[in-house]
Amino acid sequence: MSMGTFLTDKKVKIRVNGSVPGEDIDFNEGAAVTSNDSTFSGVFRWRFGEKWSVAGQYWDSSDSSFVTLTEDIGWEDYTLKAGSNIGAGVELTVARVFFGRSFHTGARHEFGLGAGLHWLEFGAFIEGEFFINDESTGFRREAVSADAPLPNIGGWYWYAFSPRWMLTTRVDWLGITVGDYSGSLWNANAAINFQAWRHVGLGLSYQYFALDVDIEKSDWNGGADLTYRGPFISLNVNW
């Protein structure tokens, strides 16, 4: 089990279509939502039987900002005009469960494959003065949200340099249409772990999560392009 801090560098773009397809809204550049964040992250793995295991992961991230627009932003059939002050925010929660089977195990390495599920919750909002056909509709808040279980396949490889040092890698992938969602998902991690004591160790890894999805819901017709990446510093406990 690992617990620690995920230092994210995030890039968030969303699209909210109206009567015609809209353009991507860059929440980092256009809405000034910060690209850097730190959040708690937890990981566990339990081996049952000689070759089978189940693993899990959880982290979330949220941020909001206020900014003066430097260019127009389109939201459905509405426009927020350059020079106006707006508030904006995004949030993402990721929960992962993965069932795997090891296919090649040696004294210093292990390779396995499996399948799992990502439960994702994503939301974004913008508040300000909205215009349609150059006429103000007043100040208000508009928001979109989506949550869905997305299946994936994946694999992992571990290699122990010595009794105390180990390199671990894993990758999950999805490229499929599920219900109202179609697109791709990547969730990858590469880590170096040091076993400081018998049951306690330290870890430093690079975490990469990317989701590029088109959404066709009654309350959100559009899409999202999300990338969260950065180091994960952890305390590892094993028994």
Task: Please report, for each region that a protein language model flagged, where it lies by residue.
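Residues on the lipid-exposed face of transmembrane beta-strands in outer-membrane beta-barrel proteins
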Residues: 3, 42-46, 97-101, 115-117, ...
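Ordered, amphipathic secondary-structure segments that act as subunit-interaction surfaces
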Residues: 92-98, 105, 110
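Transmembrane beta-barrel strands of outer-membrane/channel proteins
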Residues: 3-7, 56-60, 113-119, 157, ...
